[in-house]
């Protein structure tokens, strides 16, 4: 393994460096539990080394990891740990001339800019949408996060906890809501030191507002707050892990009273006004498709279609999202026109080449579809789904030789793929009877 992710306090993940790609190990190590399936993997018959760790994955686990424009090919020399600049901004001038005036101090920012620093990594939400022409690395501490990307939330009563939902939980806390912006992550978390007495330090924050406690609810000797008001809960997306419940409930088992919003997305940080319909539409299409909510996906499509033509034509992400949605709803000819336009604007985008191939196939342009599948593979040979679709095309046409060649090409890139090896063996001629 080339890299280890995590300090080991909760666990560790592992990354291999294969060619131009970083690949996540399907096995992870958990403190107190040992080895098990890594986050995001499901225990199954085949656990392959084929999950590419891209820019989105590493943004919060490594410092300024360098990738190509696709965000998948690793172009840096090595990964390094998160540095001071992630929270304090560019520091070259501060190193030369140390001064409080040339470095960002989160505690001195307004609440929105201050909380944006924490939320860039500790708020996952349902969808993260980049504004046009922006990438994750464009965010700078001191800015409002929504100038770079917007995190949309989908709130439901009893929703499973995720490992990076602390900021979302905290925002729902009545303590935060009534503090006027004074209570924030930094009130309890000091990233510059190790706690010597965690419960006592947190209690000091609590009693700064709750000086008088009910004797009936707080018997003598029960002086610490966390065990009852912020108990540990198990996140759904990571095995053998526990995070603190940041809703700060009055008592164990209490659920905050909230309106059911399962089919609506919202954000606490709106993007610039000119991007609001665009960003929400992209988020609704994405979440509606991945969570199986047709009404949400349809609402997202309507929002994007309502954008001025000039905006749609100049925004490949919008064109591709509309094309994908129309492809899934049987509007193949409209999808083809849209994805062709997106692919022309970004000819190096492997995903657009792939969706163009799918659209061509749905329009019975099989030869053109084959060429685009091959082109998508040339652009990004790490995408297993590209090979699977091309193999499916060859199976339907009875082209066993081309099928074997395509499987061999994937195995040349990833020789450890159990699934592809299994399929390749099935294509071997039967052994002669003895």
Question: What are the functions of these language-model segments?
Answer:
Residues 1-7, 11-18, 22-26, 37-42, ...:
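Primarily the internal scaffold of c-type cytochrome electron-transfer domains
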Residues 287, 291-294, 329, 363, ...:
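Structural motif corresponding to the intra-repeat A-B loop/turn of tetratricopeptide repeats
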Residues 305, 309, 340-344, 374-378, ...:
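Conserved structural position within tetratricopeptide repeats
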Residues 312-313, 347-348, 381, 415-416:
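Short coil turns that delineate tetratricopeptide repeat
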């Amino acid at each position: 393994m080339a890299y280890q992710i995590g300090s080991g306090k909760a666990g560790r993940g592992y990354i291999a460096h294969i060619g131009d790609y970083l690949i996540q190990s399907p096995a992870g190590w958990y403190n107190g539990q040992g080895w098990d399936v890594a986050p995001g993997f499901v225990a199954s018959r085949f656990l392959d080394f084929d999950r590419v760790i891209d820019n989105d994955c590493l943004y919060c686990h490594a410092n300024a990891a360098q990738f190509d424009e696709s965000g998948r090919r690793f172009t840096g020399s090595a990964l390094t740990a998160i540095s001071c600049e992630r929270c304090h901004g560019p520091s070259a001038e501060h190193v030369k001339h140390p001064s409080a005036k040339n470095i960002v101090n989160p505690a001195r920012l307004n609440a929105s800019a201050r909380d944006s620093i924490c939320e860039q990594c500790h708020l996952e939400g349902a969808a993260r949408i980049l504004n046009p022409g922006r990438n994750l690395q464009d965010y700078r501490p001191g800015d409002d996060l929504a100038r770079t990307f917007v995190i949309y939330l989908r709130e439901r009563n009893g929703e499973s906890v995720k490992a990076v939902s602390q900021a979302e939980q905290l925002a729902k806390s009545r303590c935060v809501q009534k503090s006027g912006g004074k209570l924030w992550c930094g009130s309890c978390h000091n990233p510059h030191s190790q706690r010597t007495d965690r419960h006592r330090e947190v209690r000091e924050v609590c009693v700064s507002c709750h000086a008088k406690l009910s004797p009936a609810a707080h018997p003598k000797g029960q002086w610490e707050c966390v065990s009852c008001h912020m108990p540990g809960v198990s996140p759904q997306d990571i095995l053998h892990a526990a995070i603190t419940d940041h809703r700060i409930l009055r008592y164990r088992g209490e659920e905050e009273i909230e309106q059911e919003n399962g089919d609506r997305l919202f954000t606490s940080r709106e993007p610039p006004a000119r991007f609001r319909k665009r960003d929400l539409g992209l988020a609704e299409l994405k979440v509606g498709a991945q969570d199986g909510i047709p009404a949400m996906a349809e609402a997202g499509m309507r929002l994007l279609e309502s954008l001025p033509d000039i905006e749609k034509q100049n925004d490949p992400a919008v064109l591709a999202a509309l094309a994908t949605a129309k492809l899934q709803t049987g509007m193949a000819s409209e999808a083809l026109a849209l994805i062709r336009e997106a692919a022309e604007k970004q000819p190096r985008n492997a995903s657009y080449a792939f969706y163009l191939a799918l659209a061509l196939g749905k329009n019975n342009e099989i030869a053109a579809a084959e060429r685009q599948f091959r082109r998508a593979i040339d652009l990004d040979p790490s995408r297993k789904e590209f090979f699977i679709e091309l193999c499916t095309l060859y199976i339907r046409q009875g082209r066993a030789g081309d099928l074997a060649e395509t499987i061999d090409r994937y195995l040349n890139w990833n020789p450890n793929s159990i699934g592809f090896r299994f399929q390749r063996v099935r294509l071997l001629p039967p052994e002669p009877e003895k």
